[in-house]
Amino acid sequence: MLACLACAPAMADETVSIGGSRAVLINPKAPRASVILMPGADGNIRPGDQGDIHGLTGNQLVRTRHAYAARGLAVLVVDAGTDLTSAVQYMAAIKRPVTVIGTSLGTIRAAQGIARGARPDALVLTSGFLSMESGSSQNVMSILGSPSSLPRTLVIHHSQDSCRATLPAGVEPFVKWSAGRARAVWVSGGLNEGDPCQAGGHHGFNGLDGQVVGIAAGFH
């Protein structure tokens, strides 16, 4: 058993600096692609010195970061202040294609980064602030204005997400607006515990991590 573990490729988490902002990198041997994970809430992951994360540890993207790496992806977990253009360039130097994956308020920050010129190869929006129908006047559509800068986009949404700013009703208007650039995948089931806008609810895909990672990791 120990010999087998010793044969497994090491995937050490490390803290890196991108444009003066700290982020956490997990770089497996010979990655097949790269992902940039943009957590929700305030986005402050509070990276330590050795690739450790002290903030938003329950967030769906933070808690599943190693699952993405286990699927052969180079993973960068960014802090709220990380410049997305710089992050995309950093990961492109490791392995393209580069997919940005944002969840909840992270979808707002992803859209803001794209509006400022970031050009990932693909975008995954989970539990997203997508359109006015999502429940928030600030959303991906309002930030981008036009779908022309939208890369190939996958929306992953829980059919029973009851968070007031990411309602399921917001998905179809966004997909229609995207002019063929976006498609949606719905998930259901899992657990719904606590605040409907937090990680323990359907909004945070509680109990569905493996399914969500599998869908997102396959889109690049």
Please provide the spans of the model-predicted regions.
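C-terminal catalytic histidine-bearing segment of alpha/beta-hydrolase fold enzymes
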Residues: 181-220
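A fold-wide structural signal in alpha/beta-hydrolase
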Residues: 34, 69-76
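The feature captures the conserved acid-bearing segment of alpha/beta-hydrolase catalytic domains
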Residues: 127-189
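Residue in the alpha/beta-hydrolase core beta-strand immediately N-terminal to the catalytic nucleophile
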Residues: 97-100, 122-124
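Alpha/beta-hydrolase active-site loop
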Residues: 59-64, 77-95, 112
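Gly/Ala-rich beta-loop-alpha elbow adjacent to hydrolase catalytic centers
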Residues: 101-110
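N-terminal cap/lid segment of alpha/beta-hydrolase-fold proteins
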Residues: 11-30
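Short, surface-exposed "cap/lid" segments of acyl-processing enzymes
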Residues: 28-67
